[in-house]
Amino acid sequence: MATINQLVNSPRKRSVVKSKVPALKACPQRRGVCTRVYTTTPKKPNSALRKVARVRLTSGFEVTSYIGGEGHNLQEHSVVLIRGGRVKDLPGVRYHIVRGALDTSGVNNRKHGRSKYGTKRPKS
């Protein structure tokens, strides 16, 4: 236990928490331009072709971000909005592309969980 004099001379250090999404620069989302759209394979127990895009952000970073949902309309030079949120089985993918914002279309024929995929309410 530190004495009062020791604490007066040098106060207790605050632990600094490292950001999990540094490219967002403490913003909820960031805009960027796709530089490459491609598929990649996940880590070991899983098997798939995951759709990802390399995005150059307005903050100056170039990050890899995941394109969720079935099917997408992204290509090089598409303007996208990205949010934080990693993909556990894709190393280095720490961001998600927001569906239904800017140049990204929503998922077609989506009935449940529509708000997460930028889909409008279907005409009943």
From Swiss-Prot:
GO terms for cellular component: small ribosomal subunit. This is Small ribosomal subunit protein uS12. With S4 and S5 plays an important role in translational accuracy. Residues 109-124 have a biased composition (Basic residues). Part of the 30S ribosomal subunit. Contacts proteins S8 and S17. May interact with IF1 in the 30S initiation complex. Belongs to the universal ribosomal protein uS12 family. InterPro entries: NA-bd_OB-fold (IPR012340), Ribosomal_uS12 (IPR006032), Ribosomal_uS12_bac (IPR005679). Keywords: Methylation, Ribonucleoprotein, Ribosomal protein, RNA-binding, rRNA-binding, tRNA-binding. PANTHER family: 30S RIBOSOMAL PROTEIN S12 FAMILY MEMBER. The gene is rpsL. It comes from Francisella philomiragia subsp. philomiragia (strain ATCC 25017 / CCUG 19701 / FSC 153 / O#319-036). Residues 102-124 are annotated as: Disordered. GO terms for molecular function: rRNA binding; structural constituent of ribosome; tRNA binding. One of its GO terms (biological process) is translation. SUPFAM superfamilies: Nucleic acid-binding proteins. The modification 3-methylthioaspartic acid is found at residue 89.
